[in-house]
Amino acid sequence: MKKESNSGISFFQRYLTVWVIICMLIGIMLGHFLPGMKEALNYLEYAGISIPLAVLIWIMIYPMMMKVDFKSIKNIGKNPKGLFVTWIVNWLIKPFTMYGIASFFFFVVFKTWITPDLATEYLAGAVLLGVAPCTAMVFVWSTLTKGNPAYTVVQVASNDIIILFAFVPIVKFLLGVSNVSVPFQTLFMSVFLFVVIPLAAGIITRLLVVRKKGTEYFEQTFLHKFDSATTVGLLLTLILIFMFQGEVVLDNPLHIILIAVPLIIQTFFIFFLAFGVCRIIRLPYDIAAPAGMIGASNFFELAVAVAVALFGTSSPAALATTVGVLTEVPVMLTLVKIANKLKEKFKYE
C-alpha cells in the first residue's frame, strides 16, 4: 500500500523540502563567504530582471508547459461542474482568502515579531502565491489520489489560459489595496517572460514532436528527457535566491516559520472548500480530488519569478514565495492522504 501511494511522485519531488533546505544553506554560505559572486550577478541584469535567474526559470517552466495538452480544451463540456468549482475557487476566492489570512497573521498575530514594512512585503509574496494555481505538480497529486486524468488535463490547461488574462489585474488590485506600488508594465512583462514565452515554446515543441514522432513517443520518452533540467533549474534558482537572502534569514530565522503558518492554513482551507463543494454537488471522487488539489497547491515557480522581477532577489517578498516552495510537498502529501481516506464519502446512492 505504501508503495502504491508514492508511485506517482519522483524521489526529488517526494523530498523537495529537504532539497530546499539544502539549497538555502548552500546559498546562504555562498553569499556570506563569497560576496563577490553577488556583486558580479548584480551586473547581469536587464530592465531590473536578473538574466541568470530568468534563464533558470525558463528551464523550470518550459518542460511544465510541454506537459499540458491544450487540445484537451475541446473536452471542456464533459465535466463542467468540476471545472466551474476549480475556476471559482482559484480565481474568485483563493487570491482574496490568501490576502485576508496572510494580512491577519502578518499584521495582527505576528506584529510583535514582524515590522509593518516587512509584513507588507511578506504579504506581497503571499499574494503572488495565492494568485497562481498549480500547473505541473497537479498531475502528481491527481495520480496519487487516482483522479480522472482527462479532467486533470482540462483543468490545468484552462487555468493556464486564465492566468494569461487574470493574473496581472488580480495581483495589481490586491497589492494596490496594500499600498504596494507595482508598475503595471513590469508586472505585465514578468507574465510575458515567465508565462507567455515558455507557454508558446511548450505548445510549439509539443506540436512539432507529436507531428513527427507521435503522442506516445512525446509523452513516454521526450518529456522525460527534461526531468533533470527542471530539477536542476529549481535547485540553482533556490541557491541563487538564498545567496541574496542570507542576511535576512540569519537576522530573522523565526520569520521562515511565521511566513509558513498562513500559507499552510490557506492551503488546507482552499482544499477543503473545493473538496467539500464537490461533495455537496455530488461530483465523483476522481473529479473532486484533483479539483481540490489544483486550488490548494501553487504555481510557486511563477510566484518566485514575479516576486524577483518586481521586488528584487534579496526582497522579503521573494523570501515569502520560497517559503511556499518549502511547505508545498509535505502539506500536499498530507492532503493526498486525507483525500484518499475520505474517498468513501463520495459514493452516492
Model regions: which residues?
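Alpha-helical transmembrane segments of multi-pass small-molecule/ion transporters
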Residues: 1-66, 71-296, 300-349
